[in-house]
A protein has these predicted regions:
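A surface-exposed partner-binding patch
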Residues: 1-92, 147-217
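Charge-rich, low-complexity amphipathic helices
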Residues: 40, 44-52, 98, 120, ...
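Compact, glycine/acidic-enriched structural inserts
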Residues: 96-134
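Short aromatic loop motif centered on NTY/YTY
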Residues: 123-157
């Protein structure tokens, strides 16, 4: 559990737009993780890695995904792999349907028809009896995954990697999401026949870690 939820007007306005079950959960546990950090729900926190507001700022990581990071979605949590749990803004409040945005493509699909069902089937279930084989393998390899880190595949699936825990490493969660956006943008904009020869890390002008995908000439 995180620090106590503050009672500022700004926080109250934020909670007022959320599904009532999520708002109630934040009043009890202001951001939390289960299954050794493999599943996270953000709160209103000092640390930007678990802060609902910071995580959704465009300049944090969403910028790297461009239009794929649909601003109508509030990313309220994630798996340690970077798949995003999200709520959709309907114009006056957030719809009480939980969506999942895939870490590799940010493709969207509804996964639970209410936040209450999400808590029961995704969070409580993973807290009590986790069963996702890759998540279990990650916990066996890494132990607890800190909430400020994600587990990433090297190379990415989009660069020809394959999903095996032996090819996974832990890095800062913001960096992981930025790298994912950089890879996605490079791959979808490259000619179909372009061959990837490597990646080059770099830092942008405000200090954010970036990744450049290098294609064969």
């Amino acid at each position: 559990m995180g620090e106590a939820l503050d009672d500022s007007d700004q926080t109250e306005r934020l909670l007022a737009g959320l599904p009532s079950v999520y708002a109630a959960a934040l009043r009890i546990a202001n951001g939390f993780t289960v299954h050794s950090g493999m599943n996270r729900v953000f709160g209103v926190r000092e640390d930007r890695h678990m802060d609902l507001r910071s995580w959704n700022e465009v300049e944090g990581w969403r910028f790297a995904w461009g239009e794929k990071a649909d601003p109508s979605f509030l990313m309220f949590g994630e798996t340690a792999f970077g798949d995003q749990y999200a709520l959709r803004w309907t114009g006056s409040s957030y719809e009480d349907v939980v969506y999942l945005l895939d870490v590799n493509l940010l493709s969207v699909r509804p996964i639970f028809n209410s936040f209450a069902y999400f808590l029961d089937q995704e969070i409580v279930q993973n807290a009590i009896s986790p069963s996702h084989p890759t998540a279990l393998a990650c916990v066996e390899k890494f132990g607890r995954v800190p909430f400020n880190e994600n587990v990433v595949l090297t190379p990415s699936l989009l660069l020809g990697g394959y999903e095996d825990v032996s090819n996974m490493v832990k890095i800062d969660s913001y960096a992981a999401m930025i790298y994912g956006g950089d890879i996605y943008t490079a791959v979808v904009s490259a000619p179909d026949e372009a061959a990837v020869v490597g990646v080059e890390p770099w830092v942008d002008d405000i200090g954010r870690p970036r990744l450049r995908v290098v294609f064969a000439d």
